[in-house]
């Protein structure tokens, strides 16, 4: 059986062919099986965020492959699009992920792009908001009026609302207090089950 995610000889170079060329990831290979937790640790600027942006097709490798259930996610446009729904990514900085006028619309963005009915979108928004600890009273507020920790929770809810098979978190507890950290980490464990 193929690994859920397999990275084969992945390299990514920024600004290739310019004086600013930088190899962010070089010849990396690993696999992640269904149900497995994987942590990636490294110092600032070591390529962690670049690496994880490849796992759902936000970045295209300079060389190498990303396989999802044995299929190269860059095989064709349809496969790339589907991989973005199957592999959810919560950014390190929620401000990079939030852009809608209301919290509700931000959480609903992914399910709406999946072509789901309004009823299913609402169900998913409410379920994901509850999962991430986003109070219903915040759903009609602007995400830009929220605290850092609340923005983080909205960003997580927006990904969870798509019900991806794989969820990748880039520093999921940044901006949360100790109780918030414990809550989110517990919810991540629950989602994995």
Predicted regions and their residues:
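ABC ATPase NBD Q-loop/coupling interface
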Residues: 16, 65-82
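Helix-to-loop junction immediately C-terminal to a conserved catalytic motif
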Residues: 56
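Catalytic Walker B motif of ABC-type/P-loop ATPase nucleotide-binding domains
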Residues: 167-170
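Conserved catalytic motifs of ABC-family nucleotide-binding domains
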Residues: 163
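Conserved ABC ATPase "signature" region
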Residues: 119-137
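Conserved ABC ATPase signature
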Residues: 142-146, 150
